[in-house]
A protein has these predicted regions:
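Short Pro-Cys-Gly-centered "Cys-loop" motif that presents a nucleophilic cysteine in a tight turn
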Residues: 1-43, 57-286
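Short beta-strand->loop micro-motif that forms the acidic, two-metal-ion catalytic signature
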Residues: 50-58
Length: 286
């Protein structure tokens, strides 16, 4: 079996997951995709503007089929909720085969689960809900309710899918299938051999090194997005960004920078204002 590392293009003007409900749906659709394709998920993480998935599968075609199935499911949901069509079809995907020799696999797993730490969303990989980081070497895993205990109608409502998943897969308190139901936890723990060695790779990953270079406060895209909506209403009495004048846009950008310490990339994602326009506005600030 070969190993493939899937990464979606990092979005600059949009975000995949606008709130916890979007993340919950994304988690369930990843479980559905794993069940439908029968492929083994080694590690994954859902970030606000991109997704990383590490798969064990026979070839690149099946890896591409996996991510396309996931994007199709989530894209349909996203369109129904937000009215944006063909958004995910245009979001590119990079697939790389990973050589398991010379600790290549360990480094990729560490890179994936440390994304949330590098983004300064959480202090440790095992405290981020929307990925597999909490699965490995964790003696306090969340317990939940087996899928077999749900009625057919309740299961479909929960998963937003009619796909049949194994009855022993578990749904946690957050309303999504827990990753340890379909992630190769034992395989990863065997690969790393011990929690000490696992933590060594986490602490020495490129993502961990990036954290050391960053300073200042950090907020999730979802928090800043909510803050931006509040600013539009309270400061300008406008319901959305599209109604703002040029001067109001500049003031909103200034407020996001001042209140949240957000950079140009993050402001562009949550407001959908062009990155170049954000940079120009910020350059005028004293």
């Amino acid at each position: 079996m070969r190993i493939f590392f899937i990464t979606t293009d990092h979005l600059e003007l949009r975000i995949w997951f606008r709130d916890d409900e979007d993340f919950r749906v994304g988690m369930n659709y990843l479980a559905v995709t794993a069940a439908v394709t029968g492929l083994k998920v080694i590690a994954f993480i859902l970030m606000s503007n991109h997704v990383h998935i590490l798969l064990a599968c026979p070839n690149r075609v099946e890896a591409l089929s996996f991510i396309n199935h996931f994007k199709q499911l989530y894209g349909t949901y996203y369109c129904n909720r937000y009215g944006e069509r063909r958004f995910f079809r245009r979001n590119g995907v990079d697939i790389q085969e990973i050589d398991p020799e010379n600790e290549g696999l360990e480094r990729v797993i560490a890179y994936i689960v440390m994304n949330s730490v590098a983004a300064r969303i959480c202090a440790s990989a095992n405290s981020y809900r929307w990925g597999s980081g909490s699965c490995y070497f964790n003696d306090y895993k969340e317990t939940g309710r087996s899928l077999s205990s749900y009625s057919g109608r309740s299961r479909i409502a929960l998963l937003k899918s009619k796909a049949m998943l194994p009855g022993n897969w578990t749904v946690g308190a957050g309303g999504y299938v827990l990753p340890e139901s379909y992630v190769s936890v034992k395989g990863v723990e065997t690969l790393f051999k011990s929690p000490l060695r696992y933590n060594f790779f986490l602490n020495n990953s490129s993502k961990a090194k990036r954290v050391k270079d960053l300073s200042g406060p950090a907020f999730r895209d979802q928090v800043i997005s909510d803050g931006f909506k509040d600013l539009c209403i309270t400061l300008f009495n406008k319901q959305d960004a599209f109604s703002l004048s040029v001067e109001e846009k500049a003031e909103a950008v200034r407020q996001l920078r001042w209140r949240f310490g957000a950079d140009s990339h993050q402001i562009s994602r949550v407001t959908s204002f062009p990155y170049s326009e954000i940079n120009e506005m910020l350059s005028r600030l004293p």
